[in-house]
Amino acid sequence: MQLQLISIVLILHFMEYTNCQHHGSRHRGNKQVSGVSSQGCQGGCQTCSVYNGCLTCKPKLFIHLERDGMRQIGVCLASCPNGFYGTRSPDRNDCIKCGSECDSCFNRNFCLRCRAGSYLHKGKCMESCPDGLVPSDTKKECVAACPALCDLCQNSDTCTRCVPGHFLHAGQCHHVCPDEFEPNDSMECIPTVHCEVSEWSEWGTCSRSGKTCGFKWGEETRTRKVLQNPSPMGSPCPPTSEKRECFVKKKRCKPPKGQRRGEKKKRFNLQEKVTAEARRERKREREKETIDREESENRNKTEQRRRRDQSRDAGTV
């Protein structure tokens, strides 16, 4: 590479000398390689040429030669482009072209990515893969031959994705998931989850139509909670409430306080009504007794008068 730089400088010397002879405008007393300069260089150049761009770069930058017809134009870059790898030395940092089969490389003998039609294997680009490996068009690499029914695999024993219609379980592809497993949306077998419930609570208060009095037979209820909902193929949850018939000693329901006062007043009014009716009934009975007695007395008096009249008539005869 140093020899290449010396050649470029000599060419520039010659071109500059020819240019001076042609124009006749330069003095030999001021003769210098005016085509090579550190003034006005751009793009990270440390020294540059009008005809060939950058000749040397600032520290940490790589010089990369781009072909322009018969010329090579030097540019300074922070990293080398695809198809080139960088080398560093105390004098300069250069971008070196990868091997013809490499699209990207770590060095000339170790490819990182291959050109179309080749597949990467251990840093080399191959048109066909070694025995036991198959080319991957997605990775552009030689990969392990997948087991049967595998669409993608980690190695020759472990699948990572199955062909359509099959399910992945423990690195293998199955027509159906094993017992106690079920498929998810990604066609993977996952453990089946069954419903879990808590213990039953204590039996509740015996009641009937929401009341706890005024009956002998009622119902009491107990409940339990769902601790784990089931997966689609898991065992469903059992009932979470249960009822049974219950017996209690019948007792009268006490009305609310306001209603109790109203009922008391109602009973008092009813009692007063009954009492008044009874008094009226007794009055009617007394009046009837008086009338009956008077009628009886009148009948007796009439009978006595009739008898006296009969006796008087008989005496007259």
Swiss-Prot record:
Top-rank taxon: Eukaryota
Keyword Zinc: no
Protein purpose: Activator of the canonical Wnt signaling pathway by acting as a ligand for lgr4-6 receptors, which acts as a key regulator of angiogenesis. Upon binding to lgr4-6 (lgr4, lgr5 or lgr6), lgr4-6 associate with phosphorylated lrp6 and frizzled receptors that are activated by extracellular Wnt receptors, triggering the canonical Wnt signaling pathway to increase expression of target genes. Acts both in the canonical. Wnt/beta-catenin-dependent pathway and in non-canonical Wnt signaling pathway.
GO molecular function: frizzled binding; heparin binding
Subunit structure, as described in the record: Binds heparin.
Keyword set includes Transferase: no
Annotated organism of origin: Danio rerio
Protein's name according to its UniProt entry: R-spondin-3
GO cellular component: extracellular space
Chain intervals with Basic residues compositional bias: 251-268
Gene Ontology annotations of biological process type: adipose tissue development; blood vessel remodeling; cranial skeletal system development; negative regulation of Wnt signaling pathway; positive regulation of canonical Wnt signaling pathway; positive regulation of non-canonical Wnt signaling pathway; posterior lateral line neuromast development; regulation of odontogenesis
Domain comment, as recorded: The FU repeats are required for activation and stabilization of beta-catenin.
Glycosylation-annotated residues: 184, 300
Subcellular location: Secreted
Keywords: Disulfide bond, Glycoprotein, Heparin-binding, Repeat, Secreted, Sensory transduction, Signal, Wnt signaling pathway
Alphabetized Pfam families for the sequence: Furin-like_2, TSP1_spondin
Cysteine pairs bridged by disulfides in the record: 41-48, 45-54, 57-76, 80-95, 98-105, 102-111, 114-125, 129-189, 195-237, 206-213, 246-253
Region (Disordered): 251-317
